Amino acid sequence: TELVGLSVDSLYSHIAWLRKIQELSWKGMENVEVKFPLIEDIRMEVANKYGMIQPGQSNTQAVRAVFVIDPEAKIRLILYYPLSTGRNFDEIKRVIQALQKADAENVATPADWRPGDDVIVPTAGSCGTAKERMENSSEDQYCLDWFMCFKREKK
């Protein structure tokens, strides 16, 4: 997993920002070092291609956007935040973990899923499989209904 920052600010603004956040102390964080690349997009070419310049918001500022792009260059998640609202990094991390879990195990994650929680197995492909799942719950798997079966996570 790699992280890349994109800003419509200049390279010099990036340098000044990186230096300043190392000097500041906020919410117990200090000497913060950004360990991912920041891309200068002063012409807003990338920001425009990804829809980060929102009508009615600003013609010179990009909205706060998060894109999760998988190794095959497929966009898996897009989150847009208004210019006035900061990102929720805990949620971004949770979504990335959920995508990685789903890809690795062919499962889905339910609402409010956290690592270690039970996951949803794919819906049965036939009536016979659905009936078998409903009748044969196990330590590893259980169903709430024919279409909603879970895999227990080992704790």
Question: Where are the predicted features?
Answer:
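Chalcogenol-based redox active-site neighborhoods
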Residues: 1-155
